[in-house]
Amino acid sequence: MAQAPDREKALELALAQIDKSFGKGSVMRLGDEVRQPISVIPTGSIALDVALGIGGLPRGRVIEIYGPESSGKTTVALHAVANAQRAGGIAAFIDAEHALDPEYAKKLGVDTDSLLVSQPDTGEQALEIADMLVRSGAIDLIVIDSVAALVPRAEIEGEMGDSHVGLQARLMSQALRKMTGALNNSGTTAIFINQLREKIGVMFGSPETTTGGKALKFYSSVRLDVRRIETLKDGTDAVGNRTRVKVVKNKVSPPFKQAEFDILYGKGISKEGSLIDMGVEQGFIRKSGSWFTYEGEQLGQGKENARNFLLENVDVANEIEKKIKEKLGIGAVLTDDEVVPAPVDF
């Protein structure tokens, strides 16, 4: 075995050769540079931002959002798009389901004029477009809706009864192998929306599984399970859903936390409703009977009136949000004036 000085010298020579061949910083000691805090894209619900542990969806990572039909998956993704745009970023939406409603997206705060939209013919085309956009280094957020709709070309060109076992899983595996490094280098967040299926013959455990094979489960830094738990009513009319999101995988913070929030029909996630729930939970808002009070000021009787008060008094809502985030240590509040630094080119 070589002596310690010789080993050190050999290592330095090897590192110099690697830097020369592959560029400076290809290999570095973990202690050489202080890692920057993970930058995030807020989800639109402070309860979900808290459950994620870092204040939102991490940039430069793969995110999977899955759940039953009409549970709020696309709504959560569109709120992330709106927040990315609000911070000065560019977002893209790969609409493989051909079901994006521009009017609904606009109501959630999405700038539909600047949103890049693609409605691809095949799964290969969708993922190739996504990969090219990511490698441009100019995109902050890309949404693929949904994995189940990424139909391989061979299946589209084949007959209706043909068997194409494992084609979609292989397609997803190859795409994620290519995209993951590029996402990290460009700081682009990729949200894959996925559907649920049931495995036949499962005796123990949940029979539910997601489409597209196992690759997405491995490559995802965050996986969100979105469920509708109750219908919100105004008298006899249904006005929205109470939604529960479980963080079933989290590589950037402790997993298995849950968040509950309201999704109102035609309006999306109720930010004010989330602030009331979290404010009461953290002790900033006092609930006495049906009355909600903040620092001696009555917000209203009943949650709906308190929600309307915060809608009309944005300064109070921002103050409550800031206090909650400071107490829980999940970063500063994102304002319209803040601009996220441009992704690093590569």
Curated annotation (Swiss-Prot):
Gene3D superfamilies: P-loop containing nucleotide triphosphate hydrolases (3.40.50.300)
Record's subcellular location: Cytoplasm
Molecular-function GO term, any one: ATP-dependent DNA damage sensor activity
Residues that bind ATP: G67, P68, E69, S70, S71, G72, K73, T74
Keyword field: ATP-binding, Cytoplasm, DNA damage, DNA recombination, DNA repair, DNA-binding, Nucleotide-binding, SOS response
InterPro entries: AAA+_ATPase (IPR003593), DNA_recomb/repair_RecA (IPR013765), DNA_recomb/repair_RecA_CS (IPR020584), P-loop_NTPase (IPR027417), RecA-like_C (IPR049261), RecA-like_N (IPR049428), RecA_ATP-bd (IPR020588), RecA_C_sf (IPR023400)
PROSITE patterns reported in the protein's UniProt record: RECA_1 (PS00321), RECA_2 (PS50162), RECA_3 (PS50163)
Keyword DNA-binding: yes
Domain of life: Bacteria
Parts forming coiled coils: none
GO cellular component, one term: cytosol
GO biological process: DNA recombination; DNA repair; SOS response
HAMAP family in UniProt: RecA (MF_00268)
Protein role: Can catalyze the hydrolysis of ATP in the presence of single-stranded DNA, the ATP-dependent uptake of single-stranded DNA by duplex DNA, and the ATP-dependent hybridization of homologous single-stranded DNAs. It interacts with LexA causing its activation and leading to its autocatalytic cleavage.
Protein name as catalogued: Protein RecA
Species annotation: Mycobacteroides abscessus (strain ATCC 19977 / DSM 44196 / CCUG 20993 / CIP 104536 / JCM 13569 / NCTC 13031 / TMC 1543 / L948) (Mycobacterium abscessus)
Protein encoded by which gene: recA
